[in-house]
């Protein structure tokens, strides 16, 4: 097992990184091969093309049971560790995608391995309770040690779920209940409401809506899919709701050269948000809430300014709409702050905030006023998993103890600077470099070139992800450090130099 392997410590020299850029040269860094993290490998090791023969055979077998066309390769998770993912053919790759941004502190972290092995934790991993009715004795303590210790400003209430989609789906329900409760006032449910809700009719099922943005991704369940607008294949053939969809800013880069253009673009989008709220109120499909990602991820790593989000928050407040921030992909530290919305600098950033991925469990925080008025209104069998809360508490301890948020900010600056250097050297392949922390991306000329670059990088020992129509995104772990950035930049510079 990887976590039983003898740990290693190789200390980085203090020599400054050396960047050499001449016409036609490749990115060179003397720091690229340095290792300073005790359970990491020292670099990629490739034995076959990926997917290799064993992966291909397993893909054929899986395809007899389900559609396996999305599978990239099969993994050996016992041998994977740190920032490196090992496949079943023995290929060791620097993983900058980290299970679609869901691995917080690397593979097989020794502290988590130790936690799993402790006898007092065995029952937590063996028994999965129905938390809504039969929680374990230590459930409250573990919530306080884990999720409540990083609760966003103004949100003292928490409901745990299993994934990002069910987190947003139930957040929508919470918003609808809150909005109807405001309209209803102190009186209870009427007989008509109780009867009509059973046949999907108003007033029991009011025609409320959630406003979302083009390019957004909020999940694949029915309500979430109505607010997801990133790829047609996610939505085709699925019935949906008549809910408003606003344009999300499409910023021009470099930002400092297009300040006025980008301000006008954001103003246009905000104006459309207000127009849609008014329009849907007149259509009797009142906008009960607005959902937005701090950075549109699946839709192409689309950014907006902090000022845009502050003004959007004001619009929600002005029109009495709940403001739901989807931190499923941006949360957990990858932007250099624990929650990406902290960059906005607001004392009242949101009414509801959803999370998952790096948080190891799903769920949403919310203000006291959004608390469901009765049991079973927001409910399912498991309501998350106590074992994930146990692991998350240790992850948060490690983030604090090892100052990983500052590490993300520093490593992210190294990565972003290197990408900007590559953009200057290979503008025909790399454009619109952007990012916050290690949450970085760039555009390629088209989808075909993007996909080819990702495949070549994988065969060179680097796992990358795509997003949007033609973007490459970076989603490394929080233990991704400067030397990992330099290692990637050296490899990718060589790929670009040879690309045809």
Curated annotation (Swiss-Prot):
Which CDD domains does UniProt cross-reference here? Answer: OAT_like (cd00610)
Q: Binding positions for substrate? A: 220
> Where are the N6-succinyllysine modifications?
231, 252, 413
Q: Which residues carry this modification: N6-acetyllysine?
A: 252, 279, 318, 413, 452, 470
Q: Where does [2Fe-2S] cluster bind?
A: 163, 166
Which annotated residues bind pyridoxal 5'-phosphate? Answer: 164-165, 381
| UniProt KW Iron keyword | yes
Task: Report the EC code(s) recorded for this entry.
Answer: 2.6.1.19, 2.6.1.22
Quote the catalytic activity from the record. Answer: 4-aminobutanoate + 2-oxoglutarate = succinate semialdehyde + L-glutamate; (S)-3-amino-2-methylpropanoate + 2-oxoglutarate = 2-methyl-3-oxopropanoate + L-glutamate
* Presequence range in chain numbering: 1-27
- Coiled-coil residues are none
Task: Identify a single GO molecular function assigned to this protein.
Answer: (S)-3-amino-2-methylpropionate transaminase activity
- According to UniProt, the name of this protein is 4-aminobutyrate aminotransferase, mitochondrial
- The protein's organism comes out as Rattus norvegicus (Rat)
Q: Encoded by which gene? A: Abat
């Amino acid at each position: 097992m990887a976590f039983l392997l003898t740990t290693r410590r190789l200390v980085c020299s203090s020599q400054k990184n050396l960047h050499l850029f001449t016409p036609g040269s490749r990115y060179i860094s003397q720091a690229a091969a340095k290792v300073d993290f005790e359970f990491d490998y020292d670099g990629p090791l490739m034995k076959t093309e990926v997917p290799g023969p064993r992966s291909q055979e397993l893909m054929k077998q899986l395809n007899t049971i389900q559609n396996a066309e999305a599978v990239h390769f099969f993994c050996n998770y016992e041998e994977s560790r740190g920032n490196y993912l090992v496949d079943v053919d023995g290929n060791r790759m620097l993983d900058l995608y980290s299970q679609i941004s869901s691995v917080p502190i690397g593979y097989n972290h020794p502290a988590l391995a130790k936690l799993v092995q402790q006898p007092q934790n065995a029952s937590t991993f063996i028994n999965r309770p129905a938390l809504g009715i039969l929680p374990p004795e230590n459930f409250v303590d573990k919530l306080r040690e884990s999720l409540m210790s990083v609760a966003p400003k103004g949100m003292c209430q928490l409901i745990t779920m299993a994934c990002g989609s069910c987190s947003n789906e139930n957040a929508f329900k919470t918003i609808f209940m809150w909005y109807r409760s405001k309209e209803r006032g102190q009186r209870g449910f009427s007989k008509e409401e109780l009867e009509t809700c059973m046949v999907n009719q108003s007033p029991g099922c009011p025609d409320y809506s959630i406003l979302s943005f083009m390019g957004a991704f909020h999940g694949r369940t029915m309500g979430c899919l109505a607010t997801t607008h990133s790829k047609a294949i996610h939505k085709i053939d699925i019935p949906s709701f008549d809910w408003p969809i606003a344009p999300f800013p499409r910023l021009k880069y470099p930002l400092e050269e297009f300040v006025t253009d980008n301000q006008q673009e954001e103003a246009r989008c905000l104006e459309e948000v207000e127009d849609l709220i008014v329009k849907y109120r007149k259509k009797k499909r009142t906008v009960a809430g607005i959902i937005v990602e701090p950075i549109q991820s699946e839709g192409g790593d689309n950014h907006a300014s902090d000022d845009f989000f502050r003004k959007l928050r004001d619009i929600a407040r002005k029109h009495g709409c709940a403001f739901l921030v989807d931190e499923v992909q941006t949360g957990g530290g990858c932007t250099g702050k624990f929650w990406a919305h902290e960059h906005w600098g607001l004392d009242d950033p949101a009414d509801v905030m959803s999370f998952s991925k790096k948080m190891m469990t799903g769920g949403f925080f919310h203000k006291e006023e959004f608390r469901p008025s009765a049991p079973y209104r927001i409910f399912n069998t498991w309501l998350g998993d106590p074992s994930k809360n146990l692991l998350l508490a240790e992850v948060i301890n490690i983030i604090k103890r090892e100052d990983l948020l500052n590490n993300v900010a520093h490593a992210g600056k190294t990565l972003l600077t290197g990408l900007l250097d590559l953009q200057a050297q290979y503008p025909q392949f790399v454009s619109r470099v952007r990012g916050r922390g290690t949450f970085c991306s760039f555009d390629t000329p088209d989808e075909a070139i993007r996909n080819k670059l990702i495949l070549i990088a994988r065969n060179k020992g680097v796992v990358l992800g795509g997003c949007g129509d033609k973007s490459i995104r970076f989603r490394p772990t929080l233990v991704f450090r400067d030397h990992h950035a330099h290692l990637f930049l050296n490899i990718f510079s060589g790929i670009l130099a040879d690309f045809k």
